[in-house]
Swiss-Prot record:
Residues 2-386 are annotated as: Nucleotide-binding domain (NBD). The N-terminal nucleotide binding domain (NBD) (also known as the ATPase domain) is responsible for binding and hydrolyzing ATP. The C-terminal substrate-binding domain (SBD) (also known as peptide-binding domain) binds to the client/substrate proteins. The two domains are allosterically coupled so that, when ATP is bound to the NBD, the SBD binds relatively weakly to clients. When ADP is bound in the NBD, a conformational change enhances the affinity of the SBD for client proteins. GO terms for cellular component: lysosomal membrane; melanosome; nucleolus; nucleus; plasma membrane; Prp19 complex; ribonucleoprotein complex; spliceosomal complex. The modification Omega-N-methylarginine is found at R469. The modification N6,N6-dimethyllysine is found at K561. Residues 614-646 are annotated as: Disordered. Belongs to the heat shock protein 70 family. Acetylated. ISGylated. Residues 186-377 are annotated as: Interaction with BAG1. This is Heat shock cognate 71 kDa protein. There is a cross-link at K512 (Glycyl lysine isopeptide (Lys-Gly) (interchain with G-Cter in SUMO2)). Keywords: Acetylation, ATP-binding, Autophagy, Cell membrane, Chaperone, Cytoplasm, Hydrolase, Isopeptide bond, Lysosome, Membrane, Methylation, mRNA processing, mRNA splicing, Nucleotide-binding, Nucleus, Phosphoprotein, Spliceosome, Stress response, Ubl conjugation.
């Protein structure tokens, strides 16, 4: 077959979708069943492996060997809390293989286990086939989407799944970003518009705010809940009917996997019906112990069962607005993505929240992400049509990134919600005299102290030529590429010696829950953090004052300008303070300030006398006038040996 165009694939938790940009527009491709979305399901039987509709259709007969939700496992460790809690709800087995989760199934009469990447690769391979059948050409290049909060390890694992499926993954892009691209092509606008994307799918919920101006997209903020979606609404209905069955027939079907599966399938169908009708009926023959289950549910009851979940979708909306520093009145467009946004109650809650504003439903919510991915695939593979030409895409980093400086302080180089790709450089210095190396520790998180943040990696820069503290200049650079991969490097300016690290760690960067939790905790702890920051700052200012003062009076330029008695007085007091500091690293802010006042009492009169006699200092004092000191950031000897410079 000849080589086909690049495709866009929305690899969803519950459903996937594939699109292609050709003849100047996006076409969403239907599968062999005529469906434009395909279940992200893989089933193993005695005779074959089924993927998509075929797998989902036989799930009731073969629940333990039908795998879905691989996206919830991908790029995570087995002991990840998310994996542990999800396992309780899955009919298939998840086993621990050297810290990584694998799904275990019976296939052709033997026990097999697969990594999540392998399961996802089967779904991706299916999407590739669907595209090839439609195009009549081989498809290799693809853009694959992931939730905005997927961390590095999850993105990498998704990319690996593509490789396993025989795809060349041009880029991993965020789902909301993809939806924004779909939206951007539909609505070309000149003036800047703020767009809120509300993506409630089968398994995940993402809210993103973007600005679109002259074909340029910028993600301003993202928020959400990795564990909210259509399946949760199904679960509420399933539990409701299990309880009803108990009441009517005095029997508990909850332990019977097949009965629960059949009930779930009926509930999912009823839910869809309730988006267009106010009532749905459920008829299951011989559900349990030969009992037929015929019942019905109203839209109002469905809404009541899910009231807290539906209302809860507004929390991330408020959070995204806060993070983007926007008021809800400043949002120009609200875009619905994901099948669950068809639920009338959710549309109403959202519309009411935005004071009756019209919602944008012009894009089929199930297809918007694949649509945008297809456009991005065309751009990356060099499509020259004008619809695509002037479109540029900017993503953001979900957490602040920085390094630890003296005293365990988190010094941020890249703030959260910074547009990527991005590069930031800052110069640091040594903390003690003749220090031969520095340890660069890279952290992500929003807290003031690194101990409260997440360590991503560390490396040493050695071979710094002997020099007094504060003299060497070490330039640290953080560089994030378009795929969100972080490179950190450090260079000693005097020798040109360099060392660097690429952060792609398996142990998983933070999950979305962690990020959410950290941001919430950060707000809660902000006050504590400020207090700690002030404390370290007053300690550092005292420390640099003492060291600078000592260096000043020992400077040979002052020979003969200062009498020995005064000089000794200052040195004694400085040494006393330095000794006190060594013993009192964790003192309170007030104590540091008190010690500094005591030291100034001794030094100020002598220094003033010097100034008057000399008419200004010859050649300027080393390290600036004492008390100017280094910026507040010197610190605990226990901290790493690196210090921030202005």
């Amino acid at each position: 077959m000849s080589k086909g165009p690049a495709v866009g694939i929305d690899l969803g938790t519950t459903y996937s979708c594939v699109g292609v940009f050709q003849h100047g527009k996006v076409e969403i491709i239907a599968n062999d069943q005529g469906n434009r979305t395909t279940p992200s399901y893989v089933a193993f039987t005695d005779t074959e492996r089924l993927i998509g509709d075929a797998a989902k259709n036989q799930v009731a007969m073969n629940p333990t060997n039908t795998v879905f939700d691989a996206k919830r496992l991908i790029g995570r460790r087995f002991d990840d809390a998310v994996v542990q809690s999800d396992m309780k709800h899955w009919p298939f087995m998840v086993v621990n293989d050297a810290g990584r989760p694998k799904v275990q199934v019976e296939y052709k009469g033997e026990t097999k286990s697969f990594y999540p990447e392998e399961v996802s690769s089967m779904v991706l391979a299916k999407m590739k086939e669907i595209a090839e059948a439609y195009l009549g050409k081989t498809v290799t290049n693809a853009v694959v989407t992931v939730p905005a909060y997927f961390n590095d390890s999850q993105r990498q694992a998704t990319k690996d799944a593509g490789t396993i499926a025989g795809l060349n993954v041009l880029r991993i892009i965020n789902e909301p970003t993809a939806a924004a691209i779909a939206y951007g092509l539909d609505k070309k606008v000149g003036a800047e518009r703020n767009v809120l994307i509300f993506d409630l799918g089968g398994g995940t919920f993402d809210v993103s705010i973007l600005t679109i101006e002259d074909g340029i997209f910028e993600v301003k903020s993202t928020a959400g809940d990795t564990h909210l979606g259509g399946e949760d609404f199904d679960n509420r209905m399933v539990n409701h009917f299990i309880a009803e069955f108990k009441r009517k027939h005095k029997k508990d079907i909850s332990e019977n996997k097949r009965a629960v599966r059949r009930l779930r399938t009926a509930c999912e169908r009823a839910k869809r019906t309730l988006s267009s009708s106010t009532q749905a009926s459920i008829e299951i023959d011989s559900l349990y112990e030969g009992i037929d289950f015929y019942t019905s549910i109203t839209r109002a009851r469905f809404e009541e069962l899910n009231a807290d979940l539906f209302r809860g979708t507004l929390d991330p909306v408020e959070k995204a607005l806060r993070d983007a520093k926007l008021d809800k009145s400043q949002i120009h467009d609200i875009v619905l993505v994901g099948g669950s946004t068809r639920i009338p109650k959710i549309q109403k809650l959202l519309q009411d929240f935005f004071n009756g504003k019209e919602l944008n439903k012009s894009i089929n919510p199930d297809e918007a992400v694949a649509y945008g991915a297809a456009v991005q695939a065309a751009i990356l593979s060099g499509d020259k049509s004008e619809n695509v030409q002037d479109l540029l895409l900017l993503d953001v980093t979900p957490l602040s990134l920085g390094i630890e400086t003296a005293g365990g302080v988190m010094t941020v180089l890249i703030k959260r919600n910074t547009t990527i790709p991005t590069k930031q450089t800052q110069t640091f210095t040594t903390y003690s005299d003749n220090q031969p190396g520095v340890l660069i520790q890279v952290y992500e998180g929003e807290r003031a102290m690194t101990k409260d943040n997440n360590l991503l990696g560390k490396f040493e820069l050695t071979g710094i030529p002997p020099a007094p503290r504060g003299v060497p200049q070490i330039e640290v650079t953080f560089d994030i590429d378009a795929n969100g991969i972080l490179n950190v490097s450090a260079v000693d300016k005097s020798t040109g010696k360099e060392n660097k690290i690429t952060i792609t760690n398996d142990k998983g960067r933070l999950s979305k829950e962690d990020i959410e939790r950290m941001v919430q905790e950060a707000e809660k702890y902000k006050a504590e953090d400020e207090k700690q920051r002030d404390k370290v700052s007053s300690k550092n200012s005292l420390e640099s004052y003492a060291f600078n003062m000592k260096a000043t009076v020992e400077d040979e330029k002052l020979q003969g300008k200062i009498n020995d008695e005064d000089k000794q007085k200052i040195l004694d007091k400085c040494n006393e303070i330095i000794n006190w500091l060594d013993k009192n690293q964790t003192a309170e802010k007030e104590e540091f300030e008190h010690q500094q006042k005591e030291l100034e009492k001794v030094c100020n009169p002598i220094i003033t006398k010097l100034y008057q006699s000399a008419g200004g200092m010859p050649g300027g004092m080393p390290g600036g006038f004492p008390g100017g000191g280094a910026p507040p950031s010197g610190g605990a000897s226990s901290g790493p040996t690196i210090e921030e410079v202005d």
